[in-house]
A protein has these predicted regions:
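Switch II of P-loop NTPase G domains
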Residues: 80-86, 96-148
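Conserved G1/Walker A P-loop phosphate-binding module
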Residues: 1-106, 379
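Conserved beta-strand segments of the P-loop GTPase G domain that flank and frequently precede/overlap
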Residues: 128-133, 156-160, 199
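Alpha-helical membrane association modules
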Residues: 228, 232, 236-408
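Short glycine-/polar-rich loops that comprise or flank the Walker A/P-loop
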Residues: 123-127, 150-154, 191-195
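AAA+ P-loop NTPase catalytic core and its hallmark functional loops
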Residues: 76, 97-113, 156-159, 164, ...
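Canonical P-loop GTPase G-domain recognition
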Residues: 160-232
């Protein structure tokens, strides 16, 4: 463990949190709160634009809803299908809600009344997608300036670019032309954020378009627990997203280590320490799902690349698909799976280094060795899983040129 890592861990264990542990003896509630609070965070994303710009298609695409038969599919069409704001929850997190707002400038929602309209609740959302399917107009600029004045987060999106590219020989040149045209309009506004993202909701992995960057921007524009909620919920990986998840997952290690050391702990065979196997297995499954390295993800990548799962594992030296597979919820059987690895960790230099770097936990809480063992075990496996996630993304980029990977 480097000095920077030690400092990072110590900073994570804030004095007020330690005091809470010591005096309230409520270790599990505090650890659970630190790990799971994002799940209770409501995030409202408004999709705003004129009728027919593709708001519903975008909402379906970002939630991977592909069929009209799906119960939460957002109706699409060139005429106005939305007469009142409607929320579409993300299937992975019902509290991440994509709002389809009525079209700007229609008979029922003229621009002059739009902001004040009681149905719209214009300033009640966390992030705004301002969408146009052709040139941006005074309407989009007007709403952006109002949001900017109020300190609201918004993103300009030029949709349906695939239509412009149909039959075009030089797609890159055409995309640059469209981008320049959009940016010239936006630059006339007073808003600080003038970036425009060009997308196709039908072709999210188009090599010349910005859907991957838009996903990244949605995370970057969020903060605190809302940022965690958006990052953990969106089912797409990009290189930047994986790096962001790495930092977020590493920041959980102290709390998951504490939870594993203190909650429903069971003696590890041949060792004088106890751990909660269920906490460890649950956290590792969360890593797999968050990083997109489940068996289903690997099978999908195999289909995309035309290679078998076994070939991908061997050719690219994927490390974590055949280790620590949780095949049971029985605590005794879990113990048999984990015990050899925990024993190895308990005798490693990494464990000794971790205990020394966290003397306040080791001495004050009385289960330093158990904590350090769980912490080191989870950290070691997280790093292996991150390597596999990055490798899978590199495979996609190499084999297809795509810079965005859907995860299950």
């Amino acid at each position: 463990m480097t000095e920077d890592e030690k400092k990072k861990i110590i900073l994570q264990w804030r004095e007020k949190d330690l005091q809470k542990c010591l005096y309230e003896k409520d270790f599990m509630s505090l650890a659970k709160s630190k790990i799971e609070s994002w799940k209770n965070e409501l995030v409202n994303v408004a999709v705003l634009g004129r009728t027919g710009v593709g708001k519903s298609r975008f909402i379906n695409a970002i939630r991977d809803c592909q069929s009209e038969k799906e119960s939460d599919y957002a109706p699409t069409g060139s005429t106005e299908t939305t007469s009142t704001p409607k929320a579409y929850p993300h299937p992975r997190n019902k509290l991440l809600q994509l709002w389809d707002l009525p079209g700007i400038g229609t008979k029922n929602f003229p621009r002059k009344d739009y902001i004040r309209h009681e149905k719209i609740r214009f300033y009640s959302y966390d992030i705004y997608i301002i969408m146009a399917s052709d040139r941006f107009t005074e309407d989009e600029v007007f709403f952006a300036e109002k949001l900017d004045e109020s300190g609201k987060v918004f993103i300009f999106v030029r949709s349906r670019v695939d239509i412009n590219l149909d039959g075009v020989d030089d797609m890159e040149a055409e995309v640059n032309k469209i981008r320049k045209d959009c940016e010239e309009i936006v630059k006339t506004s007073t808003v600080k954020s003038k970036d425009v993202y060009l997308i196709s909701s039908k072709l999210v992995d188009h090599r010349y378009l910005d859907f991957p960057k838009l996903i990244e921007r949605l995370v970057e524009k969020s903060s605190g627990l809302k940022k965690e909620a958006v990052m953990y919920s969106l089912q797409y990986n990009t290189k930047k997203m994986i790096n962001g998840k790495a930092g977020a997952l590493e920041s959980r290690l102290v709390w998951t280590g504490l939870k594993a050391a203190f909650g429903a702990a069971i003696l590890v065979p041949d060792l004088s320490l106890t751990v909660d196997y269920r906490s460890i297995s649950s956290e590792m499954e969360f890593y797999r799902k968050t990083l997109g390295i489940t068996d289903s993800d690997l099978q999908d990548l195999a289909k995309i690349t035309g290679k078998t799962v076994d070939v991908l594992k061997h050719e690219y030296k994927l490390q974590t698909f055949d280790i620590f597979k949780i095949t049971t919820k029985d605590v005794t059987e879990l113990g048999m799976q984990f015990a050899p690895y925990l024993k190895h960790i308990s005798m490693s230099e990494a464990l000794e280094s971790t205990v020394k770097s966290l003397p306040v936990i080791s001495s004050a809480l009385g289960f330093g060795i158990s904590f350090a063992t769980a912490y080191c075990f989870l950290r070691s496996n997280l790093h292996l899983m991150l390597e596999d996630a990055r490798t899978m993304f590199d495979i996609l980029l190499k084999e297809t040129g795509s810079e965005i990977l859907y995860i299950n």
